[in-house]
Curated annotation (Swiss-Prot):
One of its GO terms (biological process) is ubiquitin-dependent endocytosis. GO terms for molecular function: ubiquitin protein ligase activity; zinc ion binding. Pathway: Protein modification; protein ubiquitination. PANTHER family: E3 UBIQUITIN-PROTEIN LIGASE NEURL1B, NEURALIZED. The keyword Repeat applies. This is E3 ubiquitin-protein ligase NEURL1B. Residues 462-480 have a biased composition (Low complexity). Its main location: cytoplasm. Keywords: Cytoplasm, Metal-binding, Notch signaling pathway, Phosphoprotein, Repeat, Transferase, Ubl conjugation pathway, Zinc, Zinc-finger. Highest expression in brain, prostate and small intestine. In the brain the levels are higher in fetal than in adult stage. In the adult brain the highest levels are detected in the olfactory system, cerebellar cortex, optic nerve and the frontal lobe. It comes from the Eukaryota. Residues 38-194, 279-433 form the NHR domain. A zinc finger (RING-type) spans 503-543. It comes from Homo sapiens (Human). The gene is NEURL1B.
Amino acid sequence: MGNTVHRTLPDPSPPARLLATRPCCGPGPERRPVLGEAPRFHAQAKGKNVRLDGHSRRATRRNSFCNGVTFTQRPIRLYEQVRLRLVAVRPGWSGALRFGFTAHDPSLMSAQDIPKYACPDLVTRPGYWAKALPENLALRDTVLAYWADRHGRVFYSVNDGEPVLFHCGVAVGGPLWALIDVYGITDEVQLLESAFADTLTPARLSQARFSACLPPSSHDAANFDNNELENNQVVAKLGHLALGRAPGPPPADAAAAAIPCGPRERPRPASSPALLEADLRFHATRGPDVSLSADRKVACAPRPDGGRTLVFSERPLRPGESLFVEVGRPGLAAPGALAFGITSCDPGVLRPNELPADPDALLDRKEYWVVARAGPVPSGGDALSFTLRPGGDVLLGINGRPRGRLLCVDTTQALWAFFAVRGGVAGQLRLLGTLQSSPATTTPSGSLSGSQDDSDSDMTFSVNQSSSASESSLVTAPSSPLSPPVSPVFSPPEPAGIKNGECTVCFDGEVDTVIYTCGHMCLCHSCGLRLKRQARACCPICRRPIKDVIKIYRP
């Protein structure tokens, strides 16, 4: 099934023999030595949470979601498939197995050389190549196979399915060890018997699908400098690696991967309001891995590994204004949850080459930055609305349905919106327009009474990724008691001084505590003390570390 033929290697260890494979190019077959011993996990080079069975064929991660990096005990030959069975999967974490190769001998590694994460900790170092398996493929008993060819390309397949090209530029001049990070929802994996993959003929190679569905998690959004190849570059080069190109029209997938970024003439989503102002565009300042259409209304990020794809609104949002965007391309699955944020920093003063891949890295800047993950993964073509209320609440809507409060921000200063566009064929963000509410407009009856259905997907702030779930439980932004109406219209804000506001943790006590050093006021004193005692405690609004909480007294 698919483009691979498995030739199972025997368990006994006979002398090395030669295996003739289907020629890739040239008149004769390529002959490669095959080791009889199946690969095993390296007994010493592993993360501190990894436990191996007696045969070093099964790796189990204990505790937390990280520190699960492992390697094979021997190098992997070119075209030799590393075959893994996902034995145990535990929902509740974010992200799944990471896999790839390294040119570094695990036997020479010390415990200090093995970090918590393969992505981004290892892949930002020379000689490491790895990416994430999409969570929708990380199912129990799934068999993953991946291999490298002599051109430095890495392919993978799931359950003997079609091969998917997901890496280029791997150094194949020396030995390569398999790198496997038992991460996130993946709890246990088992190394299976090796098999060799057929080399792909030019015709089959031209039909090989480039992976557009390896979305980075928050940990993967680092700088993948050693893996820089955009989809359109890969597709353009597939037929020129001493293979020639098969005659005929280009494959559909290649055309899809090279879709230009432009303002496509297609109808506006039916869920968006009919009358939207079209005065807002993306700012010219953007990440180096994202492109804008000529009118700066569409942002495209073709890289499946994400990259540095930050885009900003051209002007600050106005209090009471709703921003409407369309995520992805209709009919295609969106590649990952959208990262959205608010900042007081004028994008015009930023340098594009200094913009990070992970927007959380901006929280250390002196300006005001707030980052949130926009809830559940949207589908391609979904219309999202972000409403900045005069009181500072930022409300999220998906396809015209209110989904609760996303952020609480300081509206005493000019605030720009920014997004991290996820890569791949579906990596596109289109500005639909804005809608300004009238303060004098009376809200429809019942529009301010949030139901359970309206807030069943309330958002959480992006917390310190090294914290455990229990450590960050108090940092979760609780659901807003007020859900926005489908059409963004608002009542006048309450006069200052009438109410101090409710605690964003318990939603019961009155806000009477200042967080030091950021100065935000969003907690009652009891919740502030509880939060301060948590490991790596950080502000629910800006995520800066909490050094102290100070109770205030009002006259």
